[in-house]
């Protein structure tokens, strides 16, 4: 992106503060493992922390954390680097999106996203004192699956279910989620199904 911006020829086709110019700018906000779009383990751990902060441990002695906020970080491990996102059209291959890096027409980016089962969400957002046009991938119907290892005895299957259900309802994942610190929104909510495998 820096090299693109440094080229004086590109100033003619770019508008400051508008993620649609250059059209490929939104690709920089996609998490992927070079194979598929996904939700990184770091984001999943943040979601577990935010959900854990809302689940009481039952410790009323006044000593230590009275929620599962800290225990969610020391007592749960996300086993994969990312959990791949699946749309009704399947997993989203990074190779199909990477090809768009040379496509200057934003409408073609929107068409490609639709063909892969998601949309490009265009929203005005405050950055500092000014409003900018931001573009992010939006998944109206999605699923992700993966495994976690629970190391803490206090985190039972019921507690883990509570943490994830509360996180899905009140915290979410991605930009403009309910727990976003500066600009919360209604996106990124999810429901959960847990299967114990060990």
Named regions from a protein language model:
Residues 1-198:
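RNA-interacting cores
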């Amino acid at each position: 992106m820096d090299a693109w911006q440094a080229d004086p020829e590109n100033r003619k086709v770019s508008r400051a503060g508008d993620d649609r110019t250059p059209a490929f700018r939104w690709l920089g906000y996609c998490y992927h493992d070079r194979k598929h779009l996904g939700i990184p383990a770091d984001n999943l751990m943040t979601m577990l922390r935010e959900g854990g902060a809302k689940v009481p441990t039952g410790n009323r002695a006044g000593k230590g954390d009275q929620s599962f906020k800290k225990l969610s970080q020391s007592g749960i491990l996300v086993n994969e680097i990312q959990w791949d996102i699946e749309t009704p059209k399947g997993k989203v291959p990074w190779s199909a999106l990477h090809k768009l890096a040379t496509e200057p027409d934003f409408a073609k980016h929107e068409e490609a996203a639709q063909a892969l089962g998601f949309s490009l969400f265009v929203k005005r957002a405050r950055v500092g004192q000014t409003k900018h046009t931001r573009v992010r991938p939006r998944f109206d119907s999605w699923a992700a699956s993966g495994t976690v290892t629970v190391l803490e005895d206090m985190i039972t299957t019921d507690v883990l279910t509570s943490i994830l259900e509360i996180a899905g309802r009140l915290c979410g994942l991605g930009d403009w989620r309910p727990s976003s610190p500066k600009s919360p929104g209604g996106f990124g909510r999810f429901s959960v199904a847990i299967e114990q495998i060990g």
